[in-house]
């Protein structure tokens, strides 16, 4: 019975993907995933990325967000991407494989920054989903809390943090934690985000020290 349910769910996801206009466009444009369009829509509404910026992309694989920001910050900008999974090389992206909370990995990021800090930190991370919100939401909150913690070490005063969060237990408490570190926090759901998904994006501006 469980196998049948998983099979039906997988088939439904596959059929949705085949019909998804963003999946089709991503394939035509040679993009790494449809998530590229989510960040593009965020950029068009908020104009967060500028030439020469240094940007850190946490949980970057397969690399669509890193791929996008390289088009916005120019050749003199700097993208540092980090993920537990391997990510195939991208022009203009400095990739570090590992857990960014690991001391050695964090040190590697700091070395790439050359004693500076980033203007923007991105996090589009998701856990491996089980399909059970009571399991998946806490796993997701654990990841976004780790990403928020990194802002203390890696983000400039006045900097911006963009993070994907799944609505559920701990969501509003997390927003309160963000308000403690940033001047403003905005909730946005890009059109490219599937309507049935619990995911939203939080844009936090004005990093406090």
Swiss-Prot record:
EC number: 2.1.1.166
Subcellular location: Cytoplasm
Catalytic activity annotation: uridine(2552) in 23S rRNA + S-adenosyl-L-methionine = 2'-O-methyluridine(2552) in 23S rRNA + S-adenosyl-L-homocysteine + H(+)
EC class (word): transferase
Residues that coordinate or bind S-adenosyl-L-methionine: 63, 65, 83, 99, 124
UniProtKB keywords: Cytoplasm, Methyltransferase, rRNA processing, S-adenosyl-L-methionine, Transferase
Disulfide bonds listed in the record: none
Role noted for this protein: Specifically methylates the uridine in position 2552 of 23S rRNA at the 2'-O position of the ribose in the fully assembled 50S ribosomal subunit.
PANTHER family: RIBOSOMAL RNA METHYLTRANSFERASE (PTHR10920), RRNA METHYLTRANSFERASE 2, MITOCHONDRIAL (PTHR10920:SF18)
Protein name: Ribosomal RNA large subunit methyltransferase E
Record organism: Baumannia cicadellinicola subsp. Homalodisca coagulata
């Amino acid at each position: 019975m469980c196998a049948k349910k998983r099979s039906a769910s997988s088939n439904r996801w596959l059929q949705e993907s085949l019909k998804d206009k963003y999946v089709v466009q991503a394939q035509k444009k040679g993009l790494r995933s449809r998530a590229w369009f989510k960040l593009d829509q965020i950029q068009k509404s908020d104009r967060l990325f500028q030439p020469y910026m240094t940007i850190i992309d946490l949980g970057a694989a397969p690399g669509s967000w890193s791929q996008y920001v390289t088009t916005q910050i120019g050749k003199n900008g700097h993208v540092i991407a980090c993920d537990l999974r391997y990510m195939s090389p991208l022009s203009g992206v400095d990739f570090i494989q590992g857990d960014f909370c690991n001391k050695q990995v964090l040190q590697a990021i700091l070395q790439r920054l050359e004693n500076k800090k980033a203007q923007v930190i991105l996090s589009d991370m998701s856990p491996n989903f089980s399909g059970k919100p009571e399991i998946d939401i806490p796993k997701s909150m654990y990841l976004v809390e780790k990403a928020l913690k990194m802002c203390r070490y890696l983000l400039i005063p006045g900097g911006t943090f963009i993070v994907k969060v799944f609505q559920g237990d701990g969501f509003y408490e997390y927003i309160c934690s963000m308000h403690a570190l940033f001047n403003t926090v905005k909730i946005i759901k890009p059109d490219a985000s599937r309507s049935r998904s619990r995911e939203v994006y939080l844009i936090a501006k004005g990093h406090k020290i």
